Design a protein with these regions (language model features):
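Glycine-rich phosphate- or other oxyanion-binding loops that anchor nucleotides, phosphorylated ligands
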Residues: 1-95, 102, 108-133
């Protein structure tokens, strides 16, 4: 996957018609749910191109369409991986409230800090998942 991923399917994927009916593996999702300290919730992820945070209007649009979470990654990588036939599990680490859902501005330093604080727990979970696969 290129370093910059556009909001459309990259032209390097031979077919734009990739079946995403089961984008995320039911088997791996079940495994992640059963792990101690694992996945605490499942939901609908809305992917935006980034690299900027979403606007309050984009967050509200995604909410109205049924999204529980918004972010700048995951979707494009999933499409590419499914195109290659990979079994995919997605785990999102929520590091901030979406724009417009809490007072104040999103602080990129705080987002990085929250990610760094959770890195060890996330690495442990991923290692335990990989040990089970």
């Amino acid at each position: 996957i290129p370093a910059t991923i556009p909001a459309t399917i990259p032209a390097t994927i031979p077919s734009p018609y990739i079946d995403l009916s089961d984008a995320y593996s039911p088997r791996l999702r079940d495994l992640a749910r059963r792990m101690e300290g694992g996945v605490s919730a499942e939901g609908v992820y809305a992917g935006f191109a980034g690299p900027q945070f979403e606007t309050p209007a984009e967050v509200e649009m995604a909410r109205r369409l049924g999204a529980d979470l918004v972010g700048m990654s995951l979707v494009w990588e999933t499409i590419a991986a499914r195109h290659l036939g990979a079994e995919v599990l997605a785990i999102s680490l929520v590091t901030n409230r979406a724009a417009g859902t809490a007072p104040g501005r999103i602080d990129p330093a705080e987002v990085s800090r929250a990610g760094n604080e959770a890195a060890g727990r996330l690495a442990d979970l991923l290692q335990r998942l990989l040990d089970q696969v």
